Amino acid sequence: MRLLIGFALALALIGCAQKGAESIGSQKENDLNLEDSSKKSHQNAKQDLPAVTEDSVSLFNGNKIFVSKEKNSSGKYDLRATIDQVELKGTSDKNNGSGTLEGSKPDKSKVKLTVSADLNTVTLEAFDASNQKISSKVTKKQGSITEETLKANKLDSKKLTRSNGTTLEYSQITDADNATKAVETLKNSIKLEGSLVGGKTTVEIKEGTVTLKREIEKDGKVKVFLNDTAGSNKKTGKWEDSTSTLTISADSKKTKDLVFLTDGTITVQQYNTAGTSLEGSASEIKNLSELKNALK
């Protein structure tokens, strides 16, 4: 009996020792993880701070460029920046933050940042491990953003975000001037769909026999048209460039004005029964259904 009791006590002591060792090992592992995390946080914070020998330049889009206070042996200023935890380096003749910086990721893909001489344009490009460009993003200080994706060195999709927040998106792209699908999104999530042909974007929306069409030139100039295939009581539309207004008429009488404002919204205002003057006040079209109702 004493032998059994002694054996049981020995097993219990061994179990306690193992648990204690596991606990210590687990604690050490946690301490190492915390230490590693702390080091990474410190390194990331350090990357976002200028060294004693650097000046910091804050760009309009939130990026920071660190510029050496003195020129290097080649007579240029050294540049440094961190984008998506990738450290980029480069040189420049100027010390204002402009220039080109490059860096590599662990998978050998690359990131390239170009800041224009006037600091008003920032271009971010991504390359795969074989050095083929896969995407680019051009951000301008006035507010527009152009994003492109490429496949096998060919343009695959493109998105233009205007300074007012409205967008133009292209997919199934043949070349820079032609795309099978184009989508324009105005304020209030109003979408018009079409295509890009010969550099001109044509998007439209249909309601019954009426088609509202927007033509957008390369330079961004817009014209709006209205077409009606009805046999009788056909609607017509007249576009006025100076006011960005489409006046809709039926039976030779003006019925309403659609105004395409610079902020990307559309307003509608009715004419009186005689069609001679506007009445009431213009109201903002809040969704696609309201726009379709305005075309009825």
Swiss-Prot record:
Transmembrane feature ranges: none
Lipid-bearing positions (S-diacylglycerol cysteine): C16
InterPro entries associated with the record: OM_lipoprot_Borrelia, OM_lipoprot_dom_sf
Effect of G198V: In strain: 21343WI, CA3 and CA7
First-listed, main subcellular location of the protein, grouped into a coarse class: membrane
Topology with respect to the bilayer: Lipid-anchor
An example Gene Ontology CC term for this record: cell outer membrane
N-terminal signal peptide: 1-15
Outcome after substituting K218Q: In strain: CA8
Effect seen on changing K89R: In strain: 41552MA
Positions of region (Disordered): 25-51
Keywords for the protein's UniProt record, in alphabetical order: Cell outer membrane, Lipoprotein, Membrane, Palmitate, Plasmid, Signal
Name of the protein in its database record: Outer surface protein B
Organism listed in the record: Borreliella burgdorferi (strain ATCC 35210 / DSM 4680 / CIP 102532 / B31) (Borrelia burgdorferi)
Gene that produces this protein: ospB
